Each structure stands twice: as structure tokens, then as C-alpha cells.
UniProtKB/Swiss-Prot annotation:
InterPro entries, sorted: Aldolase_TIM, RibuloseP-bd_barrel, Trp_synthase_alpha_AS, Trp_synthase_suA
Active-site residues annotated for this sequence: 50 (proton acceptor), 61 (proton acceptor)
EC number: 4.2.1.20
CDD domains in UniProt: Tryptophan_synthase_alpha
Lineage: Bacteria, Bacillati, Cyanobacteriota, Cyanophyceae, Oscillatoriophycideae
UniProt entry keywords in alphabetical sequence: Amino-acid biosynthesis, Aromatic amino acid biosynthesis, Lyase, Tryptophan biosynthesis
The name this protein goes by in its record: Tryptophan synthase alpha chain
Domain of life: Bacteria
Length: 265
């Protein structure tokens, strides 16, 4: 399985293409559909895929992803069952899987045990939205040793010195949160994102991915034009997958992913 860094390097060497990173919640509507969705996204233009592990107190998630997590947990989804899906599907994918999970489940299982397990099943990246920079060392070093790239988040309110510190520590890429607040679909992208991207370019040459609020191909293109190396789309994908039957949802996310990819390429 290719690493997140290698994926970005390949894209940069190929006419500086912008990466598409869709997000889905594992277990919504069920784990069988999650497995199929990973394959659909992989062949529909995704360069990497974020897979959200459902959690009972998802502080960073907006209403669409919160509802998906609740449905998934109510069906009995656990971290272990999610990792079984990753283990089954990851060998079939060209896109590396980035797990999105909160810190408490990691702490509960033990940092090294968790990291080794997710690496062994095929995940290559990790995003922990409630892990502050000041506590990131507990994950960064063991993750690096094991082969998991821990991506840190930059908030739109972050001062320049903090951006610099996060950029220095983040692995794989840097996740720029486009709006204050939780995930979710927005009608317009804030022009503040353009300024933040410019600020970040002054302190790092690492890839930057923009997420939270992108719901339309036109917004994805705008973010690319502002200089982002990746576009991360979550709620709009989760919403489409949840609507109608599982087969209808899979068809919808495949078409949406293709439209997003066409816009940014």
C-alpha cells in the first residue's frame, strides 16, 4: 500500500495535480456498504480516502456526520469491525486509507497497539481532530516508527507561529480547516482560506489539504485555484451515501466523486 506522502509526491510529479480525498463514516448504512463504497471511491477518482471511525462524542463533526456516526454505532459498529473491513478491502485499493478517529479510542487501546494494528490492516494515515499540537508527540514518534503518517489540523484562527509549528510536525500533509466550527456543507467558501494558504506557503512546502465545508465541484475548483494540494469532502459524500438504498447511495457517491475530480483536474 502506497503511503500518503508518496501519493502526494506522485501527484506533484504529474503536472502538480490536486488530490481528491473523500470521507465516509464506517458502518453507515452498514459495513458491507462501507467496503463497497471504498472500492467505488477508489475507482471514481479518489487519490486517498478518509474513513471515519464512529464515535459517541464527535466534537468536530457537523450534523450530517454526527447522524451517520449515530446510525453506525446503533448498528453495533466497533473499531475492531471497521479494521476488519480495512483489512479486507485495502489490498484492492490504489488509494491509501486515512483513518479519522478521536483520541479516546486510541488511548483506551494503547497508542502503540492501536498504531500497529491499523498499519497491519492496511491504513497508512491518521487524523485525530481532538489532539492538540501540545500533546501530539505521544502519537507522532511511534506513528513515524510504525509507518503511519499523523496529519495535524490548522484552524482558521491559528496565529502564524502556531501554523509554523504544526506544519513542522504534521506528517503526510497538513489539514487546513476552512471554517471555524464543525464539519458540514457550506454554500460558499470563505476567502480567508486563500489568505491562510498563502501564509502556510511562507512556512512550509509540505502538501496542504483543505476540508470542512466543501460540498460542490465549483468550491473544490476554487480551493485548488487558491493553491491547495488536496480537497477533502466529507458531509456531501456521507449525505449522498445515506440517501435511498445502499445501491443508490453507492451510485450517487461514485458520480459525485467523478464530478469533483473532473472539476479539479
Amino acid at each position: 500500500m502506497i503511503s500518503v506522502s508518496d501519493c502526494f509526491e506522485s501527484l506533484r510529479n504529474n503536472s502538480s495535480q490536486c488530490a481528491l480525498i473523500p470521507f465516509i463514516t464506517a458502518g453507515d448504512p452498514d459495513l458491507e456498504t462501507t467496503a463497497k463504497a471504498l472500492e467505488v471511491l477508489d475507482r471514481s477518482g479518489a487519490n486517498m480516502i478518509e474513513l471515519g471511525v464512529p464515535y459517541s462524542d464527535p466534537l468536530a463533526d457537523g450534523p450530517v456526520i454526527q447522524a451517520a456516526a449515530t446510525r453506525s454505532l446503533n448498528r453495533g459498529t466497533t473499531l475492531e469491525s471497521v479494521l476488519e473491513v480495512v483489512q479486507t478491502v485495502s489490498p484492492k485499493l490504489r488509494s491509501p486509507i486515512i483513518l479519522f478517529t478521536y483520541y479516546n479510542p486510541i488511548l483506551y487501546r494503547g497508542v502503540e497497539n492501536f498504531l500497529k494494528k491499523i498499519y497491519d490492516v492496511g491504513a497508512r494515515g491518521l487524523v485525530v481532530p481532538d489532539l492538540p499540537l501540545e500533546e501530539a508527540d505521544i502519537l507522532l514518534e511511534p506513528a513515524k516508527d510504525i509507518g503511519i503518517e499523523l496529519t495535524l489540523l490548522v484552524a482558521p484562527t491559528s496565529p502564524k507561529e502556531r501554523i509554523k509549528a504544526i506544519a513542522h510536525q504534521s506528517q503526510g500533509f497538513i489539514y487546513l480547516v476552512s471554517v471555524t466550527g464543525v464539519t458540514g456543507m457550506r454554500a460558499q467558501m470563505q476567502t480567508r482560506v486563500e489568505d491562510l494558504l498563502a501564509q502556510m506557503r511562507e512556512v512550509t512546502d509540505k502538501p496542504i489539504g483543505v476540508g470542512f465545508g466543501i460540498s460542490q465541484p465549483e468550491q473544490a475548483l476554487q480551493v485548488k485555484k487558491w493553491g491547495s494540494d488536496a480537497v477533502i469532502v466529507g458531509s456531501a459524500v456521507v449525505k449522498r451515501l445515506a440517501e435511498g438504498s445502499p445501491d443508490e447511495g453507492l451510485k450517487a457517491i461514485g458520480e459525485f466523486c467523478q464530478n469533483l475530480k473532473a472539476a479539479i483536474n
